[in-house]
């Protein structure tokens, strides 16, 4: 866990940006999340006020793993 924490902190310092996704519906939030990733943002926070937030996080985490991306996603 310390290694992951250190990696996330290094990534934050390097890029200076966290993409925060908050929307009123799950489908739009998923589209926005993917667009943010495609734009090169590597740390993402999905707001828990977004409907389906946990599903979005789970789906994006699977995509990150399948594509072996250096992207971090979590809840906020």
Where are these regions (language model features)?
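Conserved N-terminal beta1-alpha1 strand-loop-helix module at the mouth
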Residues: 1-74
């Amino acid at each position: 866990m310390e290694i992951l924490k250190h990696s996330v902190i290094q990534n934050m310092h390097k890029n200076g940006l966290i993409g925060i996704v908050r929307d009123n519906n799950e489908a739009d939030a998923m589209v926005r999340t993917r667009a943010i990733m495609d734009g090169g943002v590597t740390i993402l926070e999905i707001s828990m006020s977004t409907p389906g937030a946990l599903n979005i996080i789970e789906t994006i985490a699977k995509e990150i793993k399948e594509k072996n991306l250096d992207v971090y996603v979590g809840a906020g």
